[in-house]
């Protein structure tokens, strides 16, 4: 089968976005076609000393359709180059939440202070469908190959 670019075209859904900061209208947008994450920016100056954390406002609130969740992910470049990441990655924004999306950032670099200014990209927002589970109480669970073997049970190398 020949590669067809439309084959990988993602499905889309509408997400309502409200800008909360008139000085920094923060509309969500994707940096490149095909990106999974839309950039979230800061609307304030933020200085993070080594091992310091802050809850950073983004200036946006969203309304997701039922059956969707927004996940706040770190930006790989910030983590790799500055040691800054999202503390609770991925952060969960439920469909019913209408408040401002805020990002808990932490500077894990032991020596350097990280500085952000309004408009700087600080995280990515990924929209995903989800399945709501029906949790059923059970006295026993069916067997599996893994059973109760947990952390480290598969080894460290193949």
From Swiss-Prot:
Its EC number is 3.6.1.23. Substrate binds at residues 75-77, 88, 92-94, 102. This enzyme is involved in nucleotide metabolism: it produces dUMP, the immediate precursor of thymidine nucleotides and it decreases the intracellular concentration of dUTP so that uracil cannot be incorporated into DNA. One of its GO terms (biological process) is dUMP biosynthetic process. The keyword tRNA processing does not apply. Pathway: Pyrimidine metabolism; dUMP biosynthesis; dUMP from dCTP (dUTP route): step 2/2. It catalyses: dUTP + H2O = dUMP + diphosphate + H(+). Pfam families: dUTPase. Belongs to the dUTPase family. PANTHER family: DEOXYURIDINE 5'-TRIPHOSPHATE NUCLEOTIDOHYDROLASE (PTHR11241:SF0). Its cofactor is Mg(2+). This is Deoxyuridine 5'-triphosphate nucleotidohydrolase. One of its GO terms (molecular function) is magnesium ion binding. InterPro entries: dUTPase, dUTPase-like, dUTPase-like_sf, dUTPase_trimeric. The keyword Chloroplast does not apply.
């Amino acid at each position: 089968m020949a590669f067809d670019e439309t084959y990988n075209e993602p499905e889309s859904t509408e997400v309502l976005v409200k800008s909360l900061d008139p000085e920094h209208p923060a509309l969500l947008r994707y940096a490149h076609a095909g990106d999974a994450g839309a950039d979230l920016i800061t609307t304030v100056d933020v200085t993070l000393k080594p091992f310091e954390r802050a809850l950073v406002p983004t200036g946006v609130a969203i309304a997701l359709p039922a059956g969707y969740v927004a996940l706040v992910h770190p930006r790989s470049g910030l983590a790799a180059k500055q040691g800054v990441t999202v503390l609770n990655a991925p952060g969960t924004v439920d469909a019913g939440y209408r408040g401002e999306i805020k990002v808990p950032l932490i500077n894990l670099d032991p020596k350097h202070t990280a500085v952000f200014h309004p408009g700087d990209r600080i995280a990515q927002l990924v929209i995903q469908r989800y399945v709501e589970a029906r949790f059923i109480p059970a006295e026993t669970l069916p067997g599996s190959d893994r059973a109760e073997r947990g952390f480290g049970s598969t080894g460290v190398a193949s």
